[in-house]
């Protein structure tokens, strides 16, 4: 250790040759927002110096290309990619993401700590630094049934692991406001650590109360005024641009000379198709530049700002002593990535990963679909109420609206009405064979025929399905049982497409390219049936999340998120 440090110092002083020297680089300096024409010397995976260095075991002349720090994704759920962690690394490293922060609460809600162990073990040899925010909401709420639990003692134990930065997004904001002991115990266990927030629409005294608990950030802002208030009260604002959650254009005016240090870019949830076609956090940087943000500032929000918020020593900058995580590109505005270096090693070039990751998937994670036997009669929506609460989808957002509509029942049974775009939605508990089934109506999917189903359903990941009739709903759900989890489409009683996600019912075991092809095929088929949503299965996956306003459906029934209570249904 001391020998390496001594050698690093000698390289920095120019007394010993470097492992790698990058000549004629235009280095993005994230500390002073300047671009320096200079050279960079690397030794033992770290940057030894920036300046007049020319002698190295390997010398690459960048000929005036830009050299950026490796990008950092400040808040993402890797499970939303539907990829095994090895394939996920292939997708994001080639796009310049060399570090990320995740809380793994998706796989944890299915498998508990075993799911966390799988991701951390599988990522150990990857050229990608994964930092864990311990999941705070497993289960997310008392309004749904999860597959596992992580209590305050588990939180305390996990916080002692390497690469653990703090406590993950506290989605149960009502639990904070109402002082629920189990929620407060987790916050107390994480005292002194970074604590991420999740507080959609919270303002005024409730916002003050939430922040007073020690919660430092929020990524759920969808309106500029909301983001301004939260920033003014001391929060870091994570500006989100994911596959379903697109808030960048609305929130970008928040970033000014006075406020930019309190802002960072995140994706939250991004599909493998988007990762392959558009990129990861690099896509957010590119879009921010297109929307008018200075390129260097955009890079700061995806590197040094994130590193400083999470106290990631050695990440986020090209400077002496920092990890040699670097990106080479020719055009700063387009961020067309030519080369990616991880700890001084070339790991991706021209969008292609140069490493061959090995998957390490425990067999115990491959059997997670446990639905109590059911039939089509169990999917029937019955009511005697004159008005029915209906979930309305908002395209491009994960928030929903509550509609209270007069629906005519036939002998007490409510059916879908495709002319009015009123479809059936059901949620089936899939962890403990409890037999719980939630029933409701939803508007915004636009299907004219068939049904879609998914075992990806934030955050407890029960089975959620939307369709035009009970027979197709049944067929699509049964397909999920057959393939051990995933997504499925059924039309006229037949399965027409499905994608198997057998790892916890969330992740594929196949290569990135195959998963993307399968997803494109099923999405195309769904579009032909009338669905106008750009990401129908991503949207579907959020319809059972009872911590995002306004109306949701879980296996226990309809949830009014404003009151944080189940809505009684009279049958």
Swiss-Prot record:
Encoding gene, per UniProt annotation: ade
Annotated catalysed reactions: adenine + H2O + H(+) = hypoxanthine + NH4(+)
GO biological process: adenine catabolic process
Database matches in InterPro entries: Adenine_deam (IPR006679), Adenine_deam_C (IPR026912), Amidohydro-rel (IPR006680), Metal-dep_hydrolase_composite (IPR011059), Metal_Hydrolase (IPR032466)
Keyword Manganese (UniProt): yes
HAMAP family attached to this UniProt entry: Adenine_deamin
SUPFAM superfamilies, A to Z: Composite domain of metallo-dependent hydrolases, Metallo-dependent hydrolases
Organism field: Dehalococcoides mccartyi (strain ATCC BAA-2100 / JCM 16839 / KCTC 5957 / BAV1)
PANTHER family assigned: ADENINE DEAMINASE (PTHR11113:SF2), N-ACETYLGLUCOSAMINE-6-PHOSPHATE DEACETYLASE (PTHR11113)
Keywords of the record: Hydrolase, Manganese
Domain of life: Bacteria
Cofactor(s) annotated in UniProt: Mn(2+)
The protein, known as: Adenine deaminase
Family listed: Belongs to the metallo-dependent hydrolases superfamily. Adenine deaminase family.
